[in-house]
Amino acid sequence: MQPVTIALAKGRPAKQTIKLLQAAGLTFEELDATSRKLVFYNEDRTARVIFLKGMDVPIYVEKGAADIGIVGKDNIIESQAEVYELLDLGIGKCKFSIAAKQGVTLSSDNEITIATKYPIVAKRYFSKRNQSIDVVKLNGSVELAPLIGLADYIVDIVETGNTLRENGLEILEDIETISTKAIVNKASFATRSAEIQSIINRLSTVVG
């Protein structure tokens, strides 16, 4: 039988996730967040961890290439993947927020321009406000957009807000708090329920 495959977001998020796995007694040979390896097996090879870009984790899980994924809610929302969310791991907590240049207020007008790495989040939020928006999809340095006139506002993930303040921006409104989730492929949960639930249960004991 194929090992249960657990997809992790590589890079900085992996360090916290690996600590959780280890605390839950889930150990994998040579598993290290800084390793260039992408696949790690447990001792009896009944489970394996794979490292992916965060945005790809929900896709691998949805398509069945991974049974379980541990990834930020931001990536789950933006991927629009059809998966089960089984557990909030309580790590990687931050907020989706709307920000603009200091002194600017949040307009209720239509056709405002939003710069963001998260167009799904932005469109969903402003749709609830019955506002039509023009979204500029960026991949980095979102804070720059209002400063040079590319956008009226930004929607971004905020932890401390220091980067915004250093660039003359301020938070106008928080959209929602997000954190790291354990997600599961729907078919896998039906066919490998005992194995998957065992892993989820072990994780749940260390996250309270």
Curated annotation (Swiss-Prot):
<dbReference type="InterPro" id="IPR018198">
    <property type="entry name" value="ATP_PRibTrfase_CS"/>
</dbReference>
<dbReference type="GO" id="GO:0005737">
    <property type="term" value="C:cytoplasm"/>
</dbReference>
<comment type="subunit">
    <text>Heteromultimer composed of HisG and HisZ subunits.</text>
</comment>
<keyword id="KW-0028">Amino-acid biosynthesis</keyword>
<dbReference type="InterPro" id="IPR001348">
    <property type="entry name" value="ATP_PRibTrfase_HisG"/>
</dbReference>
<keyword id="KW-0328">Glycosyltransferase</keyword>
<protein>
    <recommendedName>
        <fullName>ATP phosphoribosyltransferase</fullName>
        <ecNumber>2.4.2.17</ecNumber>
    </recommendedName>
</protein>
<dbReference type="InterPro" id="IPR024893">
    <property type="entry name" value="ATP_PRibTrfase_HisG_short"/>
</dbReference>
<keyword id="KW-0808">Transferase</keyword>
<dbReference type="Pfam" id="PF01634">
    <property type="entry name" value="HisG"/>
</dbReference>
<keyword id="KW-0368">Histidine biosynthesis</keyword>
<keyword id="KW-0963">Cytoplasm</keyword>
<dbReference type="InterPro" id="IPR013820">
    <property type="entry name" value="ATP_PRibTrfase_cat"/>
</dbReference>
<keyword id="KW-0547">Nucleotide-binding</keyword>
<keyword id="KW-0067">ATP-binding</keyword>
<dbReference type="GO" id="GO:0000105">
    <property type="term" value="P:L-histidine biosynthetic process"/>
</dbReference>
<dbReference type="GO" id="GO:0003879">
    <property type="term" value="F:ATP phosphoribosyltransferase activity"/>
</dbReference>
<comment type="pathway">
    <text>Amino-acid biosynthesis; L-histidine biosynthesis; L-histidine from 5-phospho-alpha-D-ribose 1-diphosphate: step 1/9.</text>
</comment>
<comment type="function">
    <text>Catalyzes the condensation of ATP and 5-phosphoribose 1-diphosphate to form N'-(5'-phosphoribosyl)-ATP (PR-ATP). Has a crucial role in the pathway because the rate of histidine biosynthesis seems to be controlled primarily by regulation of HisG enzymatic activity.</text>
</comment>
<dbReference type="GO" id="GO:0005524">
    <property type="term" value="F:ATP binding"/>
</dbReference>
<comment type="similarity">
    <text>Belongs to the ATP phosphoribosyltransferase family. Short subfamily.</text>
</comment>
